Amino acid sequence: MLNLNFTNITVMGILPEAYAPFDPIVDILPIIPILFFLLAFVWQAAVKFR
């Protein structure tokens, strides 16, 4: 019988108390690569997709 315990995954998803002030920044960090991807299209539009 396979016993999977997912409580460790839940605990790892929460920042320790010492890093609580950085929580809003951590929420935004995954969006940054998407912004760079969109910036590439803006850049290519600026140079007329050469």
UniProtKB/Swiss-Prot annotation:
Organism listed in the record: Euglena myxocylindracea
Protein's job: One of the components of the core complex of photosystem II (PSII). PSII is a light-driven water:plastoquinone oxidoreductase that uses light energy to abstract electrons from H(2)O, generating O(2) and a proton gradient subsequently used for ATP formation. It consists of a core antenna complex that captures photons, and an electron transfer chain that converts photonic excitation into a charge separation.
Oligomer and partners: PSII is composed of 1 copy each of membrane proteins PsbA, PsbB, PsbC, PsbD, PsbE, PsbF, PsbH, PsbI, PsbJ, PsbK, PsbL, PsbM, PsbT, PsbY, PsbZ, Psb30/Ycf12, at least 3 peripheral proteins of the oxygen-evolving complex and a large number of cofactors. It forms dimeric complexes.
Keyword Magnesium on entry: no
Residues of the signal peptide: none
InterPro entries xref list: PSII_PsbK, PSII_PsbK_sf
Name by which UniProt lists this protein: Photosystem II reaction center protein K
Locations listed in the record: Plastid, Chloroplast thylakoid membrane
GO terms under biological process: photosynthesis
CC terms in the record's Gene Ontology section: chloroplast thylakoid membrane; photosystem II reaction center
HAMAP family given in the database record: PSII_PsbK
Protein encoded by which gene: psbK
Propeptide stretch(es), residue numbers: 1-13
Annotated transmembrane regions: 25-45
Alphabetical list of Pfam families matching this protein: PsbK (PF02533)
Sorted UniProt keywords: Chloroplast, Membrane, Photosynthesis, Photosystem II, Plastid, Reaction center, Thylakoid, Transmembrane, Transmembrane helix
Domain of life: Eukaryota
